Amino acid sequence: MNIESIRDYCLSLPLVTEDFPFDETTLAFRIMGKIFAMTDLENIDWFVLKCDPERALDLRDKYSEITGAWHMNKKYWNQINTHGMLTDDFIKSLIRHSYSEVVKKLPKKVGKESPSILSING
């Protein structure tokens, strides 16, 4: 899955925005202001996703393309290599999981006001 496809998929999820919070090359995707995915436009061979801590470890054990994210809390963030053997559908499921992990931490009233964010299962 290339970076354009990843970007398009992230932006297709409800209420997602993109910005450059750190510098002019680090692209972040947010739901309600909270980051769930990031990539460096100067090194588009990888991107990072939030993950449930237990699942993060399992994924790293099973897939060489998935490692702890550099410069992030490795307990919660995985780095995904885009040039490995992971299928597009699997990468999309990881993106949905990341989105869902962030949505779970949002205040309950946000889900009531924007129920579309609760429809994404990861």
PLM regions: where:
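Charge-dense, helix-prone N-terminal extensions
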Residues: 1-122
